[in-house]
């Protein structure tokens, strides 16, 4: 698989790997994360599978399903997850901060890379997941777990360094 540097767009090569744990339901699984190094700028990047969010220990599906429940009106304390209430509250705060930022970044990416535009009016009144899904529908189909957060992070981390949901 070929990865381009999200900072400068140059080719990358294998650099290193590390072990990382991820909570999948009530289980803790250890996986190997590959790192690549840019041949242009020398920066290194972790190549995360789409079922892991950057800097998070819970699988993306657990995070997304929990956030969807809360966005649909469920109380934080009643979220269907093994994560603690304080962790869920942190997810909600971060999602509110990053969600619409990601929508804007994806719209810019869609315009710059694919010469496609999404009118702001089409996003008016949508909740964060609705806006993410509307924008993601305009992108080419990719092989993924089909979660909005995972798909958004694939596009963002491959084209824009430092931006993720």
Regions from the language model: what does each represent?
Residues 43, 101-165:
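Long C-terminal interaction/binding lobes of large macromolecular proteins
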Residues 75-78, 99-103:
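Short secondary-structure capping/junction motifs at helix and strand boundaries
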Residues 82-101:
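Major-groove recognition helix of helix-turn-helix-like DNA-binding domains
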């Amino acid at each position: 698989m070929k990865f381009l540097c999200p900072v400068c767009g140059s080719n990358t090569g294998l650099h290193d790997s590390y072990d990382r744990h991820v909570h999948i339901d009530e289980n803790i699984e250890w996986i190997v994360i590959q790192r690549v190094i840019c041949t242009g700028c020398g920066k290194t990047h972790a190549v995360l599978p789409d079922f892991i969010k950057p800097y998070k220990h819970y699988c993306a599906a657990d995070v997304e399903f929990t956030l969807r429940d809360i966005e649909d009106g469920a109380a934080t304390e009643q979220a269907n997850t093994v994560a603690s209430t304080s962790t869920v509250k942190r997810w909600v705060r971060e999602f509110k901060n990053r969600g619409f930022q990601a929508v804007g970044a994806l719209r810019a990416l869609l315009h710059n890379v694919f010469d496609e535009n999404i009118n702001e009016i089409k996003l008016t009144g949508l909740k964060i997941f609705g806006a993410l899904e509307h924008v993601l529908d305009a992108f080419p189909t990719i092989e993924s777990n089909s979660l909005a957060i995972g798909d958004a992070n694939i596009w963002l981390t491959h084209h824009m360094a430092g931006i993720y949901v």
